[in-house]
Amino acid sequence: MAISAKDVMELRKQTDCGMMECKKALTEADGNFEKAIEILRERGLATAAKKASRVAAEGMVYADYCPACKVGVVIEVNAETDFVAKNDKFVDFVKEATKVIMKQNPADVEALMACKTEAGETVDEALKNLILVIKENIKVRRFTRYEGVCSAYVHGGGTHGILVNFETTNDIDAKDEFVAYGKDIAMQVAAANPSYVDEASVPAEVVAKEKEIMLAQMAGDPKNANKPDAVKQKMIEGKIKKFFKENCLVDQEFVKDGDLSVAQYTAKVAKDLGGDIKIVKFTRFQKGEGLEKRADDFAAEVASMVK
């Protein structure tokens, strides 16, 4: 199949590889981006362990936590232009939708649209009224709701939203020191972008694929040709350990103190507060993650939504 210059440029942007290598990989992969990235990694040309996302949509991500009811929410609402995120009516809608999710626990975005706001209208009606005022296409894209002790953090005025869920003992979550710790962990997720909480939460197939890629890289390096299998196995174990350290939250280097891992920092805080802390799960939303601006006629779409 024909590979366009645009596709080659996008792959280069995602992998930092040369233009010709990107074109060759895309050709071998029949235009499949994920397969092309895998090919480049096997050749030792691309080291990114995570899928790159093309971020193009505007709007905002918001996160909030209610300590009294122990419910946390992170939500993404998209719009056409970046200045809409600074509009008070838009921000009010996002916060109202967050409250509705907290209180009514809708199963998904479709269910959320049917929920009633404090004003008595449905979220869908409130959204259509907002579109009439702002005159832009606005969509609630996704949300996550956790019950239990949480920490919510919004970065960059709504570019990133983080929600972290914890298990604690001895009511230490009510202490100011724990609140500060929770914010630290949420900021860690924002900055270091882990994929998993710990090694146990990494799917076996992901580890197997990483090992497969590592073996392919080693096989392609002449320096490894005469190395004993035991040595190669040790090298693989070292690479897997590095993979966990980069991708598992508790194994990561704590961004505010490089002498500690997140697990060590957590243990220290728990000991100081006289209780136990376990990081259970987290959600990290980045505004527009995986979306691209479209060339569609948004005016027609907006008109159809408010009919």
Regions found by a protein language model. Name each.
Residues A2-K307:
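N-terminal assembly/interaction segments in proteins that build large macromolecular machines
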